[in-house]
C-alpha cells in the first residue's frame, strides 16, 4: 500500500474512533439524541439552534440568506452565514426535522471532533515523515480532538471548524518552508475563511508565529539555509494572500456588512490595548487540570498526560539542543504573552471583547504542546542507551509535573483538590507505564502491555475530562425542545391562516425565561419564519439597533434589541399587528379564536399601521434627545403633518430609600390612559424593578428593557422602585461596581476619574454614586390620540404593494411633495427605482425607507443587491486560478531542480 494511502487510512480510522466514541459519550451520559442533555448550552441554546432552523428553511427555499425580513426589521444574512453557518457539516440539516436540531448539534460536534483527530493524525504522520510511532500518533491525535477546548467551546459549534483545519494550515506552512509548495497552505486558508472567518483569522495569526518557529527548527536542523528561508517567506506571503482571495466570496461581503455597519467592535474597546498583564504563568500550569475552564488570566490547555509529559521531556532531555530549547521556549513564551498581555490577547481575539469566552484561540496553544511532545517521542528510544535514559526521563517528567501542578494550585489558592490530585495521579501513572515501556523494549510482551495501558489510560482520562466538562457546560432542556418547536410552529401557522396580509409579529415570551421576565432568545422569528422586529447576533446592523433604541427597545451591547414588551405606538409604526404574550397587555386585544400555545396567547394591536402608506413631506428624521416618548411623538407628528401628542409626561415624586433603592410615586394619571416608565441609567447596577406591586423585572443591567408598562387601577397612585444589585449577598460586592471608562466619563467629574481605582475593564465606582444619576421618565399614552392618528395614516395606505425577501414593489397615486413610507429598513444594497428611474430614498427615523413621489401614478421597485458580492466571486475565482497557476509553475521548477540534482 502506498505511503500516502496508509497515512490516509490511519487518519480515517483515528477520525472514526474519535467521532464514534464521542457519540458513545452521548449514549452513556444521556445527551441528545439519546437523552435530555445537550451540548447546545449558553449561546447555542439562546441563538444558534434558531439559526440552524433558519438555515434549514433557507436550504428548502422557505427563507433567504440573501435578504430576510425574519431577521430584525430586515437585513442580509450573508455575514451571519459566514460567521455562524457556513460549515459543510450543516448540510446534515437537510436530513432532519426542526424538532431534531438539538440532536443535530451534538452529532455535528462529534463529526468535527472526529475531523480534528483525523487532520491531527495526518499532520503528525506527514510532518515527522513516519518517525513518530503509530501509537504516539493515535494518542496525540486523540488528545488534540478531545482537548479541554473542544468541549468547553462545543456550544460555539462554528469555532470547531477552526480546530480541525488548523493542522492542515500548519502542515501547509511546513510544506512551504521545506519543499517550497503552497497548494495545501493556500487551499486550507481559503477553506478556513469560507467555513468560519473568525477562527480562520486566529489560525492565520498563529500561522505567522508558526512560520517563524518552523523556519528556526529547520534552520537548526540544517534542512534549509537562511537564503532559502528568506525566499520562502515571500512564497508564504504569496500563498496566504491566495488563500484570502479564495475566501473572498464570503469574506468581502462580511467585511462590508459586519464591520461596516453592525458595530462589530463593541463597547469598552478603547481598553483593548491598555498595557496590562492579566496574570502570571503559574495559572497556565494550574489550568492544566481535569475539568478546568479558561477564564480571564487563566488558560486551560489540558489534553491529557501523554502530551504534557512529552512536552516536559522535550525541554529537559539531553537530546534536545540548547538552541532547540531556546526556539521552543521563545515560541511558548510568545504564545503565553498572547494570553496574558492584554494588547496581544486582544489581537488574537480579533479585536473583540472576550468577556464571555476567554481564550478562544486556546486550541492553538494545545496544538503547540502536542507538537513539542511529538518532537520528543519521534526521537525517543532510538538506541538501547536512549531507551534507558528515556524511561528515567518520563518518570521525572510525570512526577515533576505532578508536584509542580500542586505547587501552582497552592500559589493560586485553588480549592478543587479532587481534580488536582486526580490529574497528578494520572500523570504519574502514565509516566510509570511509559517507563515500563522504554525499560522493556526487548521484552515484547511487557512493552506491549505497558503501551496498551498507556493507550487505555489516555482514552480513559480524556473521556473522564470530557464527561466533567460536558456536565459543567451542558443544557438540560433537550427533552423540552421538540414540544416547544411543534407548538410554536403551529401557533405561527394559526396566525398566518387567520390573517394572510403583510405584518410583523412580536412576542414577550420565548422558549426560556430568565429571572424576572427577561429573555434572550430573540431569533425565534428566524427559526419559525415570520416577520418580527427582534433578533440577536453579532452581525446586527448598528443603524437598526440605534433606531429601535430610539423608539423604546433598548440596544443591548450592539447585538440585540430588547423586545420583551409592547410599546403600542412603536409597534404600530413597524406594522406589528400581533403579539404573542403570556399575560394581557394594556391596549392589545386577545384573539379568542386562536389557541393558546407554549403559555402564550395571540393578541392583536388595533393600532397597527399598514406596511406602506403615503404622507405629506420628504423624510421624517427628528433629533433624538434621549427621550423615547418625545421622539415617538415627533415621528408621528412628522408623518401626520401636524402636532401629535401621543405621550404626555406625568409627575412623579422620587424618593431615595437608601444607597441602593430609589422609588417613584406617580400621581394624577389621566383617566383611561396607559402608563409607561423609563429610568435612564449611566451604568449598569443589575437592579430589580418592582412595578406597582404587579410584576418585577430585572432593570439597568443585562437584557433589561428601557421602557416598561405600568399597570394601575383607575384613580390610584402607581409606585415603582428599583433595588440595585439585588441578588448580591456580600455587602462589598453590592457597594462597588466595575464601570467601563466610556460610561464613567458620562457622569463622573474629572477629579473622580483621577482618584478612582482602575480595574481590568474600567474603574470602580460606588453603587450609590451611580444611583445618584438615576432619574425617572413617566408618560401616559392617550389611546384616543393614537387611534385618531393611526386611522388618519391608514386612510393613506398605498394602493397596491407587495413585500418579499429582497424585493419590494408598490403602485400608488401621489403628488409632488408627498412620500411613500415603507416599514422596510434602508440597508446598504437596496436599489430603488421610481417609474424606471433609479433614485435615492429619504428615511423615517433615519432608518425606515421614505420614497419621494411625483404627480400621478408612481411605480416603486426595491431590489436588494449584495454589496461587493460579485467582486468577491471574481476574487475567489482569481484566487483559484492563481493557486493552480502557481502550483504548476512551482511543480515545473521542482522537477527541473530534481532533474539537475539527479545529473
PLM feature spans:
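Membrane-embedded helix bundles of polyisoprenyl
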Residues: 18, 113-126, 133-219, 235-255, ...
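Active-site-proximal, structured, solvent-exposed surfaces of multi-pass membrane proteins
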Residues: 4, 51, 642-903
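Membrane-interface micro-motifs in multi-pass membrane enzymes
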Residues: 78-82, 105-115, 136-138, 143-167, ...
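Extracytoplasmic/lumenal acceptor-recognition loop(s) of multi-pass membrane glycoenzymes
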Residues: 457-479, 494-571, 607-610, 614-641, ...
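Periplasmic/ER-lumenal interhelical loops and adjacent helix-loop junctions
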Residues: 42, 46-57, 88, 232-235, ...
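Contiguous transmembrane helix-bundle modules in multi-pass membrane proteins
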Residues: 176, 199, 326-337, 341-346, ...
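Membrane-interface coil-to-helix junctions
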Residues: 21-117, 142-163, 202, 258-263, ...
Amino acid at each position: 500500500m502506498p505511503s500516502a494511502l496508509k497515512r490516509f487510512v490511519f487518519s480515517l480510522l483515528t477520525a472514526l474512533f474519535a467521532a464514534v466514541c464521542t457519540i458513545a459519550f452521548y449514549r452513556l451520559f444521556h445527551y441528545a439524541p439519546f437523552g435530555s442533555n445537550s451540548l447546545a448550552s449558553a449561546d447555542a441554546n439562546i441563538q444558534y439552534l434558531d439559526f440552524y432552523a433558519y438555515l434549514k428553511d433557507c436550504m428548502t427555499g422557505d427563507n433567504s440568506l440573501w435578504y430576510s425580513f425574519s431577521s430584525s426589521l430586515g437585513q442580509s444574512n450573508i455575514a451571519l452565514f459566514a460567521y455562524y453557518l457556513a460549515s459543510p457539516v450543516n448540510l446534515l440539516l437537510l436530513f432532519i426535522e426542526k424538532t431534531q436540531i438539538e440532536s443535530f448539534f451534538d452529532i455535528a460536534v462529534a463529526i468535527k471532533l472526529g475531523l480534528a483527530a483525523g487532520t491531527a493524525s495526518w499532520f503528525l504522520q506527514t510532518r515527522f515523515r513516519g518517525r513518530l510511532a503509530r501509537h504516539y500518533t493515535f494518542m496525540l491525535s486523540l488528545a488534540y480532538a478531545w482537548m479541554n477546548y473542544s468541549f468547553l467551546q462545543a456550544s460555539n459549534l462554528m469555532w470547531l471548524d477552526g480546530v480541525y483545519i488548523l493542522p492542515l494550515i500548519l502542515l501547509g506552512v511546513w510544506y512551504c518552508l521545506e519543499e517550497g509548495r503552497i497548494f495545501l497552505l493556500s487551499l486550507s486558508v481559503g477553506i478556513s475563511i469560507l467555513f468560519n472567518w473568525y477562527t480562520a483569522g486566529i489560525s492565520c495569526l498563529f500561522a505567522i508565529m508558526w512560520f517563524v518557529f518552523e523556519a528556526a527548527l529547520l534552520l537548526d536542523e540544517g534542512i534549509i539555509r537562511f537564503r532559502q528561508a528568506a525566499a520562502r517567506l515571500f512564497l508564504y506571503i504569496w500563498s496566504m494572500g491566495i488563500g484570502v482571495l479564495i475566501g473572498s466570496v464570503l469574506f468581502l461581503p462580511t467585511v462590508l456588512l459586519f464591520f461596516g455597519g453592525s458595530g462589530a467592535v463593541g463597547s469598552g474597546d478603547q481598553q483593548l490595548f491598555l498595557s496590562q498583564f492579566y496574570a502570571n504563568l503559574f495559572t497556565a500550569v494550574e489550568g492544566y487540570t481535569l475539568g478546568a475552564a479558561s477564564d480571564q488570566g487563566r488558560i486551560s490547555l489540558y489534553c491529557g498526560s501523554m502530551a504534557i509529559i512529552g512536552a516536559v521531556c522535550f525541554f529537559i532531555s539531553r537530546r534536545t539542543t540548547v538552541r532547540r530549547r531556546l526556539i521552543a521556549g521563545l515560541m511558548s513564551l510568545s504564545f503565553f504573552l498572547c494570553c496574558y498581555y492584554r494588547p496581544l490577547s486582544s489581537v488574537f481575539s480579533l479585536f473583540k471583547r472576550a468577556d464571555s469566552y476567554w481564550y478562544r484561540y486556546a486550541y492553538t496553544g494545545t496544538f503547540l504542546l502536542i507538537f513539542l511532545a511529538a518532537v520528543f517521542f519521534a526521537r525517543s528510544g532510538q538506541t538501547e542507551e536512549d531507551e534507558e535514559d528515556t524511561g528515567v526521563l518520563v518518570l521525572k517528567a510525570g512526577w515533576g509535573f505532578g508536584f509542580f501542578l500542586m505547587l501552582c494550585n497552592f500559589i493560586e489558592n485553588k480549592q478543587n483538590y479532587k481534580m488536582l490530585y486526580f490529574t497528578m495521579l494520572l500523570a504519574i501513572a502514565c509516566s510509570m507505564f511509559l517507563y515500563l515501556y522504554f525499560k522493556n523494549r526487548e521484552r515484547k510482551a511487557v512493552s506491549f502491555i505497558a503501551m496498551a495501558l498507556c493507550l487505555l489510560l489516555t482514552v480513559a482520562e480524556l473521556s473522564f475530562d470530557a464527561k466533567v466538562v460536558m456536565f459543567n457546560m451542558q443544557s438540560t432542556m433537550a427533552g423540552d425542545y421538540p414540544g416547544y418547536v411543534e407548538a410554536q410552529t403551529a401557533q405561527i401557522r394559526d396566525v398566518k391562516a387567520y390573517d394572510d396580509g403583510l405584518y410583523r409579529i412580536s412576542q414577550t415570551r420565548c422558549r426560556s425565561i430568565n429571572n424576572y421576565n427577561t429573555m434572550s432568545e430573540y431569533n425565534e422569528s428566524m427559526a419559525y419564519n415570520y416577520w418580527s422586529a427582534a433578533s440577536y447576533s453579532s452581525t446586527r446592523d448598528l443603524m437598526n439597533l440605534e433606531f429601535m433604541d430610539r423608539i423604546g427597545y433598548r440596544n443591548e451591547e450592539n447585538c440585540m434589541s430588547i423586545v420583551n414588551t409592547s410599546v403600542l405606538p412603536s409597534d404600530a409604526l413597524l406594522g406589528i399587528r400581533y403579539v404573542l404574550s403570556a399575560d394581557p397587555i394594556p391596549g392589545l386585544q386577545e384573539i379568542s379564536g386562536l389557541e393558546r400555545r407554549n403559555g402564550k396567547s395571540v393578541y392583536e394591536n388595533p393600532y397597527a399601521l399598514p406596511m406602506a402608506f403615503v404622507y405629506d413631506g420628504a423624510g421624517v428624521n427628528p433629533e433624538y434627545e434621549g427621550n423615547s416618548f418625545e421622539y415617538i411623538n415627533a415621528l408621528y407628528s412628522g408623518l401626520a403633518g401636524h402636532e401629535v401628542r401621543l405621550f404626555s409626561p406625568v409627575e412623579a415624586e422620587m424618593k431615595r430609600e437608601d444607597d441602593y433603592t430609589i422609588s417613584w410615586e406617580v400621581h394624577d394619571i389621566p383617566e383611561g390612559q396607559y402608563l409607561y416608565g423609563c429610568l435612564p441609567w449611566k451604568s449598569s447596577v443589575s437592579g430589580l424593578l418592582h412595578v406597582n406591586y404587579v410584576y418585577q423585572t430585572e432593570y439597568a443591567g443585562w437584557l433589561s428593557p428601557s421602557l416598561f408598562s405600568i399597570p394601575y387601577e383607575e384613580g390610584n397612585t402607581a409606585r415603582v422602585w428599583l433595588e440595585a444589585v439585588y441578588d448580591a449577598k456580600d455587602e462589598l460586592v453590592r457597594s462597588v461596581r466595575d464601570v467601563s471608562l466610556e460610561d464613567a466619563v458620562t457622569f463622573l467629574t474629572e477629579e473622580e476619574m483621577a482618584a478612582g481605582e482602575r480595574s481590568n475593564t474600567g474603574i470602580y465606582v460606588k453603587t450609590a454614586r451611580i444611583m445618584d444619576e438615576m432619574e425617572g421618565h413617566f408618560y401616559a399614552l392617550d389611546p384616543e390620540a393614537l387611534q385618531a392618528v393611526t386611522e388618519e395614516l391608514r386612510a393613506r395606505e398605498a394602493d397596491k404593494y407587495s413585500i418579499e425577501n429582497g424585493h419590494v414593489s408598490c403602485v400608488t397615486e401621489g403628488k409632488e411633495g408627498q412620500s411613500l413610507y415603507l416599514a422596510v429598513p434602508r440597508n446598504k444594497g437596496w436599489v430603488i427605482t421610481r417609474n424606471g428611474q433609479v433614485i435615492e430614498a429619504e428615511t423615517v427615523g433615519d432608518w425606515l425607507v421614505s420614497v419621494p413621489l411625483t404627480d400621478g401614478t408612481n411605480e416603486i421597485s426595491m431590489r436588494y443587491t449584495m454589496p461587493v458580492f460579485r467582486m468577491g466571486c471574481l476574487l475567489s475565482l482569481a484566487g483559484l486560478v492563481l493557486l493552480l497557476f502557481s502550483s504548476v509553475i512551482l511543480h515545473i521548477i521542482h522537477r527541473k531542480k530534481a532533474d539537475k540534482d539527479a545529473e
